[in-house]
Amino acid sequence: MKAVIILGLVLLSVTVQGKIFERCELARTLKRLGLDGYRGISLANWVCLAKWESDYNTQATNYNPGDQSTDYGIFQINSHYWCNNGKTPGAVNACRISCNALLQDNIADAVTCAKRVVRDPQGIRAWVAWRNHCQNRDVSQYVQGCGV
């Protein structure tokens, strides 16, 4: 019985953690989902963005007390503008998606929403982490050795 409880706790901790992509695994997945060159944004820039926003973690969340919004998933997509979490005051939900969908191990919905984000005038500059860590830098290291 004790072993069953311990196994249950281990499985629960794995479930809560979500998927943490390896760098090259993410690069291949993003390429397959059509992000390489989308709106002129290189695959390396997308991988750099994911590194600095979530450390490649699909379950990453970050609460923003200023506007009571939360950032979700591998790209840290914000509930004030892009998704619906049922809690953020004045939310727009421009991606027309539940924020929980952005926390799935299958990142297809997150990629679709990220494509919507970059169609806005700010483009990829909407992400502070991209501006701080990727913009005007050599980001080729993020796809180096990945065969993409």
From Swiss-Prot:
Catalytic EC class: hydrolase
GO molecular function: lysozyme activity
InterPro entries in alphabetical order: Glyco_hydro_22, Glyco_hydro_22_CS, Glyco_hydro_22_lys, Lysozyme-like_dom_sf
Function according to Swiss-Prot or TrEMBL: Lysozymes have primarily a bacteriolytic function; those in tissues and body fluids are associated with the monocyte-macrophage system and enhance the activity of immunoagents.
Signal sequence extent: 1-18
UniProt-listed Enzyme Commission number(s): 3.2.1.17
Misc. remarks from the entry: Lysozyme C is capable of both hydrolysis and transglycosylation; it also shows a slight esterase activity. It acts rapidly on both peptide-substituted and unsubstituted peptidoglycan, and slowly on chitin oligosaccharides.
Keywords recorded for this protein, A-Z: Antimicrobial, Bacteriolytic enzyme, Disulfide bond, Glycosidase, Hydrolase, Signal
Listed name of the protein: Lysozyme C
Subunit structure: Monomer.
Pfam families membership: Lys (PF00062)
Family note: Belongs to the glycosyl hydrolase 22 family.
GO biological process: defense response to Gram-negative bacterium; defense response to Gram-positive bacterium; killing of cells of another organism
Reaction catalysis annotation: Hydrolysis of (1->4)-beta-linkages between N-acetylmuramic acid and N-acetyl-D-glucosamine residues in a peptidoglycan and between N-acetyl-D-glucosamine residues in chitodextrins
Domain C-type lysozyme stretches: 19-148
Active site: E53, D71
Organism: Allenopithecus nigroviridis
Disulfide linkage: C24-C146, C48-C134, C83-C99, C95-C113
